[in-house]
């Protein structure tokens, strides 16, 4: 659903943007995804989506994934991004938090800023939708999925 306005923080000022093209995912086309999977296609799903008015809008990928978890009954999910996982100290890869209890996600907001806050909110919603295990890992490295599954990132369960 397309948002009519968005608040944006620029330095110390907060601005209201009314001509934005962002929205929030409210449902997933499960039939299309299942059609692709049943015919041995691997769908690559990205943040742009269609609004209720058939406009192309940008969406929050982490929230979209949470909605997909519920719609497709996903048990395990891997999320790759530009960090080694959840860090205690922003930018310090040596401060990686290896394991997080899904029932204690609220305790980890103190370590997040910017996009990581949205990732944590998306993770909370994904677990509320039935997710059992979430891997956060670095997508910039060689063999990122294999390394994520081997525990070279943050595992939330």
Segments and roles (model prediction):
Residues 1-157:
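C-terminal catalytic "cap/lid" subdomain
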């Amino acid at each position: 659903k397309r948002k009519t306005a968005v608040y944006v923080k620029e330095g110390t000022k907060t601005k209201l943007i009314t001509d934005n093209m962002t929205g929030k995912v409210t449902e997933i086309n499960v039939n299309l995804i299942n059609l692709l999977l049943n015919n041995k296609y691997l769908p690559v799903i990205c943040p742009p989506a269609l609004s209720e008015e058939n406009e192309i809008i940008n969406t929050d990928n982490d929230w979209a994934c949470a909605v997909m978890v519920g719609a497709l009954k996903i048990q395990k999910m891997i999320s790759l991004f530009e960090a080694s996982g959840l860090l205690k100290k922003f930018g310090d890869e040596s401060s990686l938090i290896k394991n997080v209890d899904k029932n204690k996600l609220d305790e980890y907001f103190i370590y997040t800023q910017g996009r990581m806050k949205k990732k944590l909110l998306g993770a909370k919603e994904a677990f509320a939708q039935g997710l059992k295990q979430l891997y956060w890992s670095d997508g910039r490295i060689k063999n990122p999925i294999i390394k994520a599954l081997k525990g070279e990132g943050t595992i939330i369960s």
